[in-house]
Every structure is written in structure tokens, then in C-alpha cells.
Amino acid sequence: LTLYKGELLCLLGGNGAGKTTLLKILSGIKKPWRGNVKYVRKESAGYLPQNTQSMFIKDTVKEELLDGADGDEARALDMAEQMELTGFLMRHPYDLSGGETQRLAAAKLLLGQKKVLLMDEPTKGMDAWTKEQLGRHLRKLCSQGISILLVTHDLDFTAAYADRCAMLFDGMV
């Protein structure tokens, strides 16, 4: 499986196929049992886990965004607007709905300005409009040379935004 510069590659597969495990291996969280992973620069990859609660350590959504933007308030607030989070800036991240939590996690990852994004079901819990906003933002990032490997069950999102898709069955692409 090769991820090219500026590409949005969606990885599809059933439950238990190994999609999340593959992302964890690519991000360095897990070691592969066999095979190997070749990186241009491993430190240039950002990982969005399926369970995003572990990403939040601050008291407010705004503080989380500022943390992701290295204190750049203009960038943080711009991302809040893009991800429809402006109405929640003073709320605690744990008080958000599932879709709002996903948007905050995606926003925080996107603010990290990584060259490779590994995203595990980022559209989970999002409404159609917010998925479209995320898809457009991801396409914009790809046009800037950022590569994205995105795990999803959302065929419509894949058809609308992916350059390519790969299928994973029992750990095999």
C-alpha cells in the first residue's frame, strides 16, 4: 500500500478487518508482526484515533484549538469557524456531542500542520453538511501536498472526496 504526496486515500473494510490496527502500525503506536513500514519522515505524520477523548487535556474547546495551533489565536479561531465550533469555544471538550467531538479532534489534528494525516473514521457522528466541510478541507490540504490515509465505512464520502480507495480484508489489502 503506497500513499502518494497530495493524495487522499480511503481505506475501506468490514469490522475487524484490521483498518485501525494498520493505522496504529503506520503511526508507530503498534509494531507489525511481519512486513515493514517505510517512511520518508515518520515525525511528519499526525494520527487521529477512533476514540478521540484521549486527545483532550484542556478545559475548553478554545484552549484545545490554541494548543493545536501552537498558541496562534487567528489560526485557532479560523479552524473553529471552518469546523463549526465557534458556538462551543468555552465549553469543556467532554461536554460536546459525538459529532462535535469528532469535529474538534479533526480540527486539532489539522492545526498540527503535518505532511501526512492518518485519520480513523473522522466522519463518525458528523452530519452531512459537516462531512462536506471536512471533505472540502481535506481536498484543500491535498492540493497543498499533504497526504491523507483515511479509514471510513462511508462509501458516499469516499466516492466524493478520495483520489483512490483500498479495501482491507483479514489484514490484507
Language-model regions, residue ranges each:
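H-loop (His-switch) and adjacent beta-strand-loop-beta switch element
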Residues: 165-173
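H-loop/switch region of ABC-family ATPase nucleotide-binding domains
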Residues: 152-153
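Catalytic Walker B motif of ABC-type/P-loop ATPase nucleotide-binding domains
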Residues: 117-120
